[in-house]
Structure formats: structure tokens, C-alpha cells
């Protein structure tokens, strides 16, 4: 039974799923805004918010944690140097998910836009 299990599987094994979510999070940090399905947006929201919270600590350990989690130095430094100071006075809720009226043509999935507030 699947009681108290968090997160979606997205029809992937654990390793490819982690890589998929990490790449989507990297794209969001790099661009500031990503249009994707509603389920994917909901899946990366807590992950990215936690990364911004880690970056707000402004310590060497926080910087190394970001580097290990994101595995992209430019993106990790953007979180550490740009996003964390921008949200220093904010406790949480760094991201906004806006549901779109459009759906994908090929499979009818509902699209959403996830962006930084």
C-alpha cells in the first residue's frame, strides 16, 4: 500500500526521476519562469523553495549543499548570490504556480506556469 508516500513517480525509476526534477529546477532558476504540466510544477515547487531557503543561510556549507544538489555551478551561484538576498526578508512562498487555460494538444495535460514571485 502507498500510505504516507510523498511525491509523484512520473513513470520513472528513482535515478532518472531525480535527474528529471533537478533539470527542471535548474531551468526554472536559470529562466525565472517555466511552463510545464501542473503535476511537474507542483513537484518542483518544494524542492526549489528549499534550495532558496538553504541559500539564505549564506555559509560555506550552504554553498556546497547547493552545488551538490543542483550539480550546475552557474545555477547554484545564481541561487546563492541573486535569489537568496532577494528573498532574505521573506519566510517562504518564493514561487507562484499559475494554472493556464490551455492544455497540451497531444495528450490534453493541463499546463501551468511556475515562476518566482
Which residues make up each language-model segment?
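Ribosome large-subunit tunnel/peptidyl-transferase-proximal elements
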Residues: 1-88, 102-117
Amino acid at each position: 500500500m502507498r500510505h504516507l508516500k510523498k511525491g509523484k513517480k512520473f513513470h520513472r525509476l528513482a535515478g532518472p526521476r531525480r535527474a528529471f526534477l533537478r533539470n527542471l529546477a535548474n531551468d526554472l532558476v536559470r529562466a525565472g519562469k517555466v511552463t510545464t504540466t501542473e503535476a511537474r510544477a507542483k513537484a518542483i515547487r518544494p524542492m526549489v523553495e528549499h534550495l532558496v531557503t538553504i541559500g539564505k543561510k549564506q555559509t560555506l556549507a550552504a554553498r556546497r549543499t547547493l552545488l551538490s544538489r543542483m550539480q550546475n555551478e552557474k545555477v547554484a551561484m545564481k541561487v546563492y548570490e541573486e535569489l537568496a538576498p532577494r528573498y532574505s526578508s521573506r519566510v517562504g512562498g518564493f514561487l507562484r504556480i499559475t494554472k493556464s487555460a490551455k492544455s497540451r494538444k497531444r495528450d490534453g495535460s493541463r499546463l501551468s506556469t511556475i515562476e518566482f514571485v
